[in-house]
Amino acid sequence: MAPKKPEPKKEAAKPAPAPAPAPAPAPAPAPEAPKEPAFDPKSVKIDFTADQIEEFKEAFSLFDRTPTGEMKITYGQCGDVLRALGQNPTNAEVLRVLGKPKPEEMNVKMLDFETFLPILQHISRNKEQGTYEDFVEGLRVFDKESNGTVMGAELRHVLATLGEKMTEAEVEQLLAGQEDANGCINYEAFVKHIMSG
């Protein structure tokens, strides 16, 4: 018989080292705000009547400062024309529909009426625009005596420091002739004045 080979010694199984505690899960990244798709004027269906379009074209032409009357306005004038036509977009909304131009482009880039019309249609469909009642209600908060007026100085401060801040010159232009002898402003009349253009 063949001699038995000694069996190799089996090492005693060492206990596995205790697993390190799992690191705390990384905090989930903050969800990104959904990006609004870029505004595409070609995708806007125009619902205005021929008479309305003619009226809009006439108003648009009043803002045309090109030497030869090319029916073009600067990007910087777009919000003014929209407001002159009874719309009330925020500056941010105007910039969005213009493709978020750089500040230095606002008085250089031009917009023709055919490009402006879909912008006007889009803005006019926006239901988030403030109404007369919304603005009056917002100003009523500052009517400490419940007499239909707000202090002109307080309104100046609010317009220059909150929301879409206005420059001092813009505030003065807006409030020109609105204050009474006591420095108060009848806010219902003020809102009517602003919304009438």
Swiss-Prot record:
Keywords: Atrial fibrillation, Disease variant, Methylation, Motor protein, Muscle protein, Myosin, Repeat. PROSITE patterns: EF_HAND_2 (PS50222). Residues 16-32 have a biased composition (Pro residues). Signal peptide: none annotated. Residues 1-13, 33-42 have a biased composition (Basic and acidic residues). It is linked to Atrial fibrillation, familial, 18: A familial form of atrial fibrillation, a common sustained cardiac rhythm disturbance. Atrial fibrillation is characterized by disorganized atrial electrical activity and ineffective atrial contraction promoting blood stasis in the atria and reduces ventricular filling. It can result in palpitations, syncope, thromboembolic stroke, and congestive heart failure. Regulatory light chain of myosin. Does not bind calcium. Myosin is a hexamer of 2 heavy chains and 4 light chains. This is Myosin light chain 4. It comes from Homo sapiens. The gene is MYL4.
